[in-house]
């Protein structure tokens, strides 16, 4: 009996980050009770961390990002590693609390970056869920689009800043 419970649990947990895994993410409810905020997170330049410092450091980065996500969001929602360097949080919080939690996450990640020089930046997008106005799937897609929009914007600004420095 204990083995069966352990086996079921390990099928739902990502072994590296100890967050819920993609299987759990894909079996999440199609609707949520009340308002929620869905965050999509992606580790910036993760491939270069792996290529430069090795997969051991890359794994440590993912574990640290997962730990930071859990520390900030676990009391208000579900935290998932959905694959590679992508994470999702479904938080049962109000729209007005969304910025507060995002700020807390970024502050915590910055504090951890001081201790771990390999910890890169994380791009985050989020969208608010209102059961009477949209589906969970639509909100997830919006959050994902916002995250990629932010990531492209950062790369564009970095290129512009580098071009300015070179000239």
Predicted regions, residues:
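Catalytic core regions of nucleotide second-messenger enzymes
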Residues: 81-82, 109-127, 157-160
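Residue-level signal for beta-strand positions within conserved beta-sheet cores that form or flank
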Residues: 34, 75, 118-122
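A structural signal for short, well-ordered beta-strand segments
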Residues: 38, 87, 122-126
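Catalytic-core segments of nucleotide cyclases and related cyclic-nucleotide turnover enzymes
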Residues: 103, 110, 128-165
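Signal-transducing coiled-coil linker helices
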Residues: 1-16, 20-35
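Gram-positive cell-envelope targeting signals
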Residues: 1-11, 40, 45, 52-53, ...
């Amino acid at each position: 009996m204990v083995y069966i419970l352990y086996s079921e649990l390990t099928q739902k947990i990502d072994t590296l980050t100890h967050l819920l895994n993609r299987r759990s993410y894909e079996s999440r409810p199609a609707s949520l009770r009340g308002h929620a905020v869905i965050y999509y997170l992606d580790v910036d330049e993760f491939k270069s961390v792996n290529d430069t410092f090795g997969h051991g450091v890359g794994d440590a980065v993912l574990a640290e990002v997962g730990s930071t996500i859990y520390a900030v969001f676990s009391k208000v929602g579900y935290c998932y590693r959905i694959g590679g360097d992508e994470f999702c949080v479904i938080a049962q919080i109000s729209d007005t609390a969304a910025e507060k939690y995002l700020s807390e996450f970024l502050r915590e990640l910055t504090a951890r970056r001081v201790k771990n020089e390999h910890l890169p930046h994380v791009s985050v997008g989020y969208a608010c869920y209102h059961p009477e106005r949209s589906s969970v799937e639509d909100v997830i897609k919006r959050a994902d689009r916002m995250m990629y929009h932010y990531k492209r914007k950062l790369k564009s600004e970095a290129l512009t800043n580098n071009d300015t420095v070179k000239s």
